[in-house]
């Protein structure tokens, strides 16, 4: 497929962007139980607006706790069933490995694999996340980056293209500034 015929996507991190993170000592952690998996306000509407504008919406999430045995694959799948039921995402890409894996953010592997699978042009696509790993993965994949500043104690390695307070604000900015 030629670049002109390829699709545009918005890649979304999961924890802290779509659902509430468990905060400990200024750092975000993924929920470990389905009952802790709460979709943030305005997320379903924001994703619907992106889809109405013609974007694919693909979740890219590191879930190292599953790989370490701290959370189960069954719980992760139940969370993603809940996510799919409440938010109209096109795909959910998961890496349970850890830093050594090419798919584990900040490495761009999940974005590159999804782009291949969905015929996505990364040069006109966007990564939205709440951590330095998301910004770095988006930059490495050649995407525009939006950083959701949740006030975490960790710093960024690279400067995001845009900084916003939540996903609905990011989507308003994307739809206002990018021709679709």
Write out the residue ranges for each language-model feature.
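Substrate-recognition element of Asp-dependent hydrolases with the DxDx(T/V) motif
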Residues: 43-80, 89-98, 138
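A short acidic, helix-capping loop that chelates divalent metal ions and anchors anionic groups
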Residues: 27-30, 65-69, 98-102, 154-157
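Short, surface-exposed alpha-helical recognition segments that flank or form part
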Residues: 34-38, 71, 102
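Asp-based, Mg2+/Mn2+-dependent phosphohydrolase catalytic module
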Residues: 2-8, 73-91, 100-127, 131-180
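Short, solvent-exposed loop/turn segments at secondary-structure junctions
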Residues: 17, 64-65, 133
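Active-site neighborhood of HAD-like aspartate-dependent phosphohydrolases
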Residues: 2-58
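Conserved protein kinase catalytic core
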Residues: 19-21, 26, 68, 136, ...
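Short loop/turn and capping residues at structural boundaries
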Residues: 22, 61, 93-95, 126, ...
């Amino acid at each position: 497929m030629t670049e002109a015929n390829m699709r545009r996507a918005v890649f979304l991190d999961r924890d802290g962007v779509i659902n509430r993170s468990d905060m400990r000592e200024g750092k975000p952690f993924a929920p470990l139980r389905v009952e802790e998996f709460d979709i943030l306000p305005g997320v379903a509407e924001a994703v619907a607006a992106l889809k109405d504008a013609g974007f694919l919406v693909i979740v890219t999430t590191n879930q190292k706790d599953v790989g370490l045995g701290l959370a189960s694959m069954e719980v992760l799948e139940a969370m993603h069933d809940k996510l799919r039921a409440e938010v109209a995402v096109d795909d959910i890409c998961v890496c349970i490995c850890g830093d050594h894996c090419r798919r584990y953010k900040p490495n761009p592997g999940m974005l590159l694999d999804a782009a291949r699978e969905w015929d996505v042009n990364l040069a006109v696509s966007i990564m939205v996340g709440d951590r330095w790993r998301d910004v770095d993965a988006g930059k490495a994949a050649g995407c525009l980056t939006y950083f959701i500043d949740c006030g975490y104690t960790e710093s960024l390695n690279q400067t995001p293209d845009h900084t916003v307070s939540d996903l609905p604000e990011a989507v308003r900015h994307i739809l206002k500034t990018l021709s679709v």
